[in-house]
């Protein structure tokens, strides 16, 4: 439609119908950070306009304003400005601010991808972490099985990338993943992913409020007889069988700092080595954090978006 012309309602309905046929994909903020201060409303007023200043102070969201300052400050090293080919976003998880930036350095002309834990407490690095090697790490075996319910036209939250059958997943209406690694794994099997929780956890930005137009039910794919509560109804597709190998046992009793990728692993580990509760522990910001923080005080539990970040900050 040309600007200023009267809208043909018949053509508009046809356009809307065709537009809705497109698959909607919301890209992850960890890979595609937004422009600095994106979404914040700026307003100019005179220095002596006290009335306007008082009104703005009443409605201003101070936490968001502070995040905007951090994002703009990050761009200052290149002179700032909207013309920079750099995205930067600050997110807050359990009182820990994380800055994610990606783009092209105007000085070196090279592309970069950076993640910084801004409010990170200084941590003394150690020589022995758990797990020390993800390739050799094993606390459970997963026995893949058929889906416990039909997936046709359902909205799904995928937490793992391995499945006994892929075709049933292609019949789903909408697919979200718990993180970007799961997204990449299932995408290799020909699945179109519509969005991801980005490793921030199920409660950070609920799927039905942020990632879907229709507030219809979402089902979480998980393991059978999962006794831990989820905000989503579940569909099982594998069994979790305790099976800890020799490398992991040795690593478990040698480690000084621990990163937990699931509460199940944490629960099994403290049965084998109870003094882990007095050691340094860390995990992601989602359900694992929520469950472990009921056992270990939150102030003693570090939060990292993934294992690689934990390794970067805690391994000497």
Residue positions per predicted region:
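Signature of uroporphyrinogen-III synthase
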Residues: 104-316
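Small-molecule-sensing regulatory modules
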Residues: 1-125
């Amino acid at each position: 439609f040309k600007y200023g012309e009267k809208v043909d309602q018949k053509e508009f309905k046809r356009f809307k119908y065709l537009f809705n046929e497109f698959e909607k994909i919301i890209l992850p903020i960890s890979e595609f950070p937004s422009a600095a201060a994106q979404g914040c409303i700026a307003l100019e007023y005179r220095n002596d306009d006290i009335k306007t200043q008082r009104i703005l102070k009443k409605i201003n969201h101070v936490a968001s304003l502070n995040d905007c300052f951090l994002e703009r400050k990050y761009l200052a090293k290149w002179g700032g400005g909207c013309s920079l080919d750099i995205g930067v976003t600050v997110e807050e998880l359990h009182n820990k601010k994380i800055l994610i930036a990606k783009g092209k350095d105007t000085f070196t002309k090279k592309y970069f991808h950076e993640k910084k834990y801004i409010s990170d407490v200084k941590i003394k690095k150690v020589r022995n972490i758990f797990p020390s090697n993800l390739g050799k790490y094993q606390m459970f075996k997963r026995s893949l099985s058929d889906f416990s319910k039909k997936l046709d036209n359902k909205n799904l939250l995928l937490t793992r990338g391995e499945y006994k059958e892929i075709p049933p997943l292609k019949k789903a209406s909408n697919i979200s993943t718990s993180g970007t690694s799961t997204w990449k794994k299932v995408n290799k099997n020909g699945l179109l992913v519509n969005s991801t929780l980005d490793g921030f956890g199920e409660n950070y930005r609920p799927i039905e409020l942020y990632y879907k137009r229709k507030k219809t039910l979402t089902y979480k794919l998980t393991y059978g007889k999962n006794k831990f509560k989820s905000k989503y109804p579940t569909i099982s597709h594998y069994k979790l069988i305790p099976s800890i190998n020799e490398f992991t046992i040795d690593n478990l009793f040698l480690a000084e700092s621990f990163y937990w990728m699931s509460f199940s692993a944490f629960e099994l580990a403290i049965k084998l080595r109870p003094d882990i509760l007095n050691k340094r522990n860390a995990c992601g910001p989602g359900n694992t954090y929520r469950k472990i923080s009921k056992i270990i005080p939150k102030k003693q539990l570090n939060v990292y978006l993934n294992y690689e970040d934990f390794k970067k900050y805690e391994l000497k």
